[in-house]
A protein has these predicted regions:
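Short beta-strand->loop
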Residues: 1-11
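Generic structural hydrophobic/aromatic packing signal, biased to beta-strands
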Residues: 1, 16-19, 57, 113
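A bilobed periplasmic-binding-protein/Venus flytrap-type ligand-binding module shared by bacterial periplasmic
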Residues: 12-29, 43
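Conserved C-terminal helix/tail region of periplasmic/extracytoplasmic solute-binding proteins
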Residues: 107-198
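Secondary-structure end/capping motifs
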Residues: 26-132
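Flexible, active-site-adjacent loop/turn segments at secondary-structure boundaries
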Residues: 6, 20-21, 91
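Helix N-cap / beta->alpha transition motif
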Residues: 3, 19, 102, 130-138
Length: 198
């Protein structure tokens, strides 16, 4: 048995998704939503707040469980095997490079969907990434919170199979996988974005 962190260290945990027409119609609300999530992440990352968070999550309104079952940031030492215990950084709520949208990760997910036959790999993948993964909204929110413009440090994604994903060559990545299927490449036609004048 492997944990998700053993398969992909630092993988994205959650994704905020909104409809494009909503984001275009309510850009200020979109930025405010991202700011609220960043502030909540910063609050959750502060160990001074962990007891309060455990109490809230353990309450009947949420998980209805015992507080001691809820771990924030400090992995349990309980283990089911005799191997040396490895601790991974879990529940990373806030920090340098966290929470920033990653077009590299989005692109990797597109390659996986194409790899397993769920979608054709989009020939116009750059256009799709620019429409789907709007880094500008995050950058605006982080600047307004005076976090600075958090830069994404792009590095290859490497999973347990030791095949590095290079975002510069997604087709080459698909063609060099040990476990592979035939995949198709097709132009994905996107509707024109709708912008609302302020």
């Amino acid at each position: 048995v492997a944990t998700d962190m053993e398969i992909w260290q630092g993988h994205p945990g959650k994704v905020l998704g909104v409809r494009e027409d909503w984001a275009n119609r309510y850009p200020n609300t979109h930025v405010a939503l991202v700011k609220a999530l960043l502030e909540a992440g910063r609050y959750c990352a502060d160990t001074k707040n962990h007891q309060e968070i455990r109490e809230i999550l353990a309450s009947r309104n949420y998980l209805a469980t015992k507080e001691e079952y809820i771990q924030l940031g400090e992995p349990s030492n309980y283990s089911c095997n005799l191997d040396k215990h490895v601790e991974y950084a879990h529940h990373m709520f806030f920090g340098d490079g966290l929470n920033r949208p990653s077009r590299t990760e989005h692109l990797w997910m597109m390659t996986q969907m194409a790899r397993w036959g769920h979608i054709p790999f989009p020939r116009n993948w750059v256009e799709i990434l620019e429409r789907v993964c709007r880094v500008g909204t995050f950058s605006t929110a982080s600047r307004e919170l005076e976090l600075g413009d958090l830069k994404y440090r792009r590095s290859p994604i490497q999973l347990f199979d030791d095949v590095a994903f290079d975002a510069e060559d997604p087709i080459g990545y698909l063609n060099h996988l040990g476990i592979e299927r035939n995949f198709t490449i097709a132009e994905v036609h996107l509707a024109s974005p709708t912008f609302v004048a302020a």
